[in-house]
Design a protein with these regions (language model features):
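Transmembrane alpha-helix signature in integral membrane proteins
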Residues: 54-61, 135-164
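Transmembrane alpha-helices
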Residues: 253-291
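C-terminal transmembrane helix and the adjacent membrane-cytosol boundary/short C-terminal tail
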Residues: 235-236, 240, 247, 271, ...
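Cytoplasmic-entry segments and transmembrane alpha-helices of multi-pass inner-membrane transporters
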Residues: 83-88, 158-197, 224-233, 357-359
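Interhelical loop and adjacent transmembrane-helix boundary motif
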Residues: 287-337
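Generic hydrophobic transmembrane alpha-helix motif, especially the helices
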Residues: 183-219
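Membrane-cytosol interface at the C-terminal ends of specific transmembrane alpha-helices
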Residues: 152-172, 176, 209-248, 252-260, ...
């Protein structure tokens, strides 16, 4: 009886390499290819006298994707080519998302910088005719900060405490009902909030009672659901282990919330509040109805007389027309953007200040 030993088949040594063993394109190849493609497409469009930034960008993107994917497939293999295709699409979507923001900032900066100076920020429109090359937005800046500040004082305690109730206490049908109405309030048009406050003010103070406090309440109606939803998400991110550790030490629930949960989520809560402020600081329709649109002097009293705000100031200047008024409107728009950026910077600082310190 003889035994035969069968050797296992060896690996096939074909000429084709695996995708994982293919070569790779040079590190700077994508950037160089993009620059070359953009230059070639621009030259072709200029040669046919049909150059346009939109058409140039579209053709450059299509040509770049086709060339880079084809080159990657031939040199690096199909797997790497698919990876480059998806990566290129992700970067392209990011650029498309950033394009409107950059365009808005560039347009506002280009048109508003000419009149944006200390004089514009330190004087009001009191005694200034629409055709005069004078006046500024100081009264509108004061009104914006005052109205938004009061709206924040109203909405933040209500919104944060509602979020605490939803996360720590509410259950079942009550929780679902509150969340449903919060979601409904999130989609309320701003003009509806303004009409609601106008109707309330007519009942309480009679017709024609417009002041900054009414505008603040209208903005608070818009802010509360945003604060609730953002605060709820931040409170849910607090690890349950921190709560359990506090309970194990005999700390009551209310003290656990105030000493553990809220400080731990302070940075996120601050960011959510700033998002809510950014959501309402540019509202125009409710403030026209509630705070008025004809104030030209500085008003420090939220409860007496009309109060101008930056969005309403922009609207009134554009409505009057004329080159000088348009310049004031652009400068006010730039001021509003800078105010929002400053508020976000302050929010970051406050969030870092109250965030729990690592030991």
């Amino acid at each position: 009886m003889s035994l035969t030993t069968t050797q296992p088949p060896g690996p096939e040594m074909g000429p084709a390499k695996s995708d994982l063993r293919r070569g790779s394109l040079p590190h700077r190849f994508p950037a160089a290819l993009l620059a070359a493609t953009a230059a070639v497409v621009a030259g072709v469009l200029l040669a046919f006298s049909s150059f346009g930034f939109v058409l140039w960008g579209l053709l450059t993107a299509v040509a770049y994707v086709v060339i880079v994917v084809t080159a990657s497939a031939r040199v690096e293999g199909g797997r790497k080519a698919r990876d480059r295709l998806v990566t290129t699409l992700v970067y392209g979507c990011f650029l498309l998302a950033m394009l409107p923001l950059v365009s808005v900032l560039w347009t506002v900066l280009g048109n508003g910088f000419a009149r944006f100076d200390p004089y514009f920020l330190s004087v009001s429109m009191n005694g200034v005719l629409p055709s005069m090359d004078a006046g500024g937005a100081y009264h509108a800046i004061v009104g914006t900060l005052a109205i938004t500040g009061l709206a924040t004082l109203i909405s933040v305690p209500i919104g944060v405490m509602t979020a605490v109730y939803l996360v720590e206490y509410a259950e079942g049908r009550m929780k679902r009902t509150i969340m449903f109405f919060v979601d409904v309030m999130t989609g309320i048009p701003s003009i509806v909030a303004g009409l609601f406050v106008v109707a309330l003010w007519i009942i309480l103070f009679g017709p024609g009672a417009t002041n900054g406090a009414a505008g603040a309440i209208a903005l608070a109606v818009l802010m509360i659901p945003v604060v609730v939803r953002s605060s709820e998400e931040m409170l849910r991110l607090v690890p349950q282990d921190l709560r359990e550790a506090s309970y194990a030490l005999g700390v009551p629930k209310w003290r656990t919330i105030t000493k553990v949960v809220l400080p731990t989520s302070a940075a996120g809560l601050t960011t959510g509040i700033m998002l809510a402020i950014a959501r309402v600081i540019g509202e125009t329709a409710p403030l026209i109805l509630t705070a008025g649109s004809s104030a030209v002097s500085i008003n420090w009293n939220l409860f007496d007389g009309q109060m101008m705000s930056l969005p309403v100031f922009i609207y009134s200047q554009v409505r009057m027309g004329g080159a000088v008024n348009y310049e004031r409107a652009w400068a006010a728009a730039l001021t509003l953007i800078l105010v929002v950026m400053l508020l976000f910077f302050l929010a970051r600082m406050i969030g870092r200040l109250f965030a729990p310190k690592a030991r």
